[in-house]
Amino acid sequence: MSLRSCSTEMIPEFTVTEITDLVRQVMHDTFYCIKIRGEISGLSRPSSGHVYLSLKDDNSVISAVCWHGTRLDVQFENGLEVICTGHISTYQSRYQLVIEGMVLAGQGKLAAMLEERRKKLEKEGLFDQARKKPLPLLPLKIGVITSPTGAVIRDILNRVKHRFPSHIIVWPVQVQGSQASAMVVQAILGFNNLEEPPDVIIVARGGGSIEDLWPFNDEELARTAAASKIPIVSAIGHETDFTIIDYAADVRAPTPTAAVEIVLPERQQLVSDIAHKLSKIRSAVRNVLGAKEHRLLQLYGVLTETKHKISEVGRSALAHQEKIEFLFKVALLKKQQYLDNLIGRIDRYNKEHIISVGYAVIYDNTGQHVSSANAVAPDDTIVIEWKDGKRRAAILT
């Protein structure tokens, strides 16, 4: 009906407040429980704890709010396509969806979003093997981040008990819903900040749908796990389930119980392995000692033989020394005799010897020895020396 087809008297009149209340009532009565599919955008989390966001499709946008304390199975994240359950309310002449429940929609888009995130973090080097920390051989203290209730924690504790009893510290968290990823992040940081931190951390939850496991695809959680100083083992879902934290963790276990088997050795097997290795060590030591003993005996034999040879050489050297000394004395005696003969011969030609036996020595006027008659001439003066004195004489002819 158009305004022209009715008289103004037939049109009801409302105040602003009345029409606002009427629209609010109509909205509430008509859309008191609805589902809206859309993509999350404009996400805001003020300190009040409420969550404000928009849901959009290709053509339209609607505001939405989730009041603090509302428990949801899915974590808010920009870009997620979701189906929200709730009611329409009006606020300051605007309408909005009050979210009371939410599930993920469009798993194909979720898978594409997950792969895009994985490639982004992989490109940053967050998953590089060089960043991975080795697990301790036998952790004395194990931190477990999981729900404090349910089968997972019971399975873990039971497996630890039967495998190798260790000190377990459980950090209780939600493993599903909008608060799950933030709680796991705080748990990892909390373990790292303890004065006596655990030797290894297991992050675990049971299997579930992609929506149930989605908190473990959170980017902040992946970065926190990669930055942990304590080695982290992820055990999320079943063997076929893969989440982002599996790539960021140091080790991925297919199940929570498998995580315990990776972290802890089986006690009896460990004892058996140690005994076997000790046996091998003892055998190796015996072999080494036997070889060394054999070598020492060889060296002792060589040393004894060498000692005998040295003794023989010593005796031979002593004999040679005595022979050399004897030959040296004989040679020295011969040389002494030769020298004595030589001295005797020299003495026979000595002036004093010649004079002493009655001969005389003649000198010319210059004092030179005259050994020939031709060395002097008539009228030359000469000196004649006998053993008892000298006399001058003249050559007459």
Swiss-Prot record:
One of its GO terms (cellular component) is cytoplasm. It holds the Pfam family Exonuc_VII_L. It comes from the Bacteria. It catalyses: Exonucleolytic cleavage in either 5'- to 3'- or 3'- to 5'-direction to yield nucleoside 5'-phosphates. Keywords: Cytoplasm, Exonuclease, Hydrolase, Nuclease. GO terms for molecular function: exodeoxyribonuclease VII activity; nucleic acid binding. It is found in: Cytoplasm. Its EC number is 3.1.11.6. GO terms for biological process: DNA catabolic process. Heterooligomer composed of large and small subunits. NCBIfam families: xseA. Bidirectionally degrades single-stranded DNA into large acid-insoluble oligonucleotides, which are then degraded further into small acid-soluble oligonucleotides. Belongs to the XseA family. This is Exodeoxyribonuclease 7 large subunit. It comes from Anaplasma marginale (strain Florida). The gene is xseA.
